[in-house]
Regions:
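Transmembrane alpha-helical segments that form core, pore/gating elements
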Residues: 24, 50, 120-122, 126, ...
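C-terminal transmembrane-helix exit sites in multi-pass transporters
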Residues: 49-57, 97, 116-141, 267-287
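Hydrophobic/small/kink-forming positions within alpha-helical transmembrane segments
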Residues: 17-20, 24, 86-91, 95, ...
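Membrane-interface helix termini and inter-helical loops of multi-pass transporters
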Residues: 24-35, 101-102, 151-161, 213-226, ...
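Helix-helix packing/entry segments at the starts of transmembrane helices
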Residues: 16, 39-41, 94, 108-115, ...
Length: 306
């Protein structure tokens, strides 16, 4: 049992490492492709990768094949739930996150995204009528102050575009909706199946937007050698491996405990931003990250002890 618990926590940490890196990979790709094209190709790569995994697993296990045949009907029965989940994430979430990142810096973007666990209990209070404690509220205030601390300079002026802030917080709200939909899906399907189905539906959502945005803002598809590696990394590691690992951790730990891992995203992003793209991390950003993480831990610890 202890070994299984270690595996669950390991999956959560690895997922956050890949998502921390995804902010850097996206920044690299955005130098050549517009966000919509990046997301569309990212989902195509993910669907191909996950499809191959499912095919190999199907070939190597008859029991798995029989189980999947039985689950085909169940997937059709819950197609509306899959469609809603995919609308939240990857479709809307990727749009807001990508355009937010385009108008911000990786570390600041990841710190805002890390506030998702703060808004989850607030949404649960209104939608699921779950109790909202004073520790939820206190943690929310502290973390929010941390985000503001990172967004303002000494003259109290914004260090990033207001447009980027709006996009990123929109991504946070969408992710909260996705967490609520995912809660039911993890009780019915395996993590790999959930990730595969939601990415296929998400890719379908992006098809018309891809053709519209390519006409408005053409991408530099010709220079593929300059961005193929980070693009493949987004599709394989961020959209496939990370989502599958996190869905597994989510199914074992529940929403509150699983969302705690989001605290690690800005930490990993800050570390890898310095190493890979040479982003400067000053004391103000470090203090902001610490406030965000401190507030998140404060709000979650009391929930878990209840």
């Amino acid at each position: 049992m202890k070994d299984k618990g270690v595996i669950v926590h390991f999956c959560g940490v690895v997922a956050m490492i890949f998502w921390g890196l995804s902010f850097i990979w996206s920044t690299q790709v955005f130098s050549y492709l517009n966000p919509t094209t990046t997301i569309f190709f990212r989902l195509i790569i993910s669907c191909i990768f996950l499809g191959l995994l499912l095919f190999i697993k199907d070939r190597t296990s008859r029991k798995f094949a029989e189980a999947e045949k039985q689950k085909e009907v169940r997937i059709k029965d819950n197609l509306k739930l899959f469609a809603i989940a995919a609308l939240f994430e990857p479709f809307l979430y990727f749009i807001f996150e990508s355009y937010g990142l385009l108008n911000s810096a990786p570390v600041v973007s990841s710190a805002i995204i890390a506030t998702i666990p703060l808004f989850t209990p607030i949404a649960a209070f209104f939608i699921l009528r779950e109790r909202l404690t004073r520790w939820n509220i206190l943690g929310f205030i502290i973390s929010f102050l941390g985000v503001i601390f990172m967004l303002l300079n000494k003259s109290l002026e914004l260090t990033v575009s207001p447009k980027g802030i709006i996009f990123l917080f929109s991504a946070v709200f969408v992710a909260v909706g996705y967490s609520i939909a995912l809660r039911k899906l993890t009780m019915l399907y395996k993590p790999l199946t959930i990730t595969f189905i939601q990415n296929i539906i998400g890719m379908i959502y992006f098809i018309p937007m891809f053709f519209i945005m390519e006409r408005i803002s053409p991408s530099n598809i010709a220079g593929i050698s300059n961005y193929i590696l980070p693009l493949l990394s987004l599709g394989v590691f961020a959209s496939s491996v990370a989502y599958t690992l996190w869905a597994y951790a989510f199914s074992k730990l529940g929403a509150s405990k699983a969302n705690i891992y989001s605290n690690l995203i800005p930490v990993f992003t800050a570390i890898f931003s310095c190493i890979i793209i040479g982003e400067t991390i000053n004391i103000q950003k470090i203090l902001g990250i610490l406030l965000v993480i401190g507030g998140l831990i404060l709000s979650q610890l009391k929930i878990n002890n209840k």
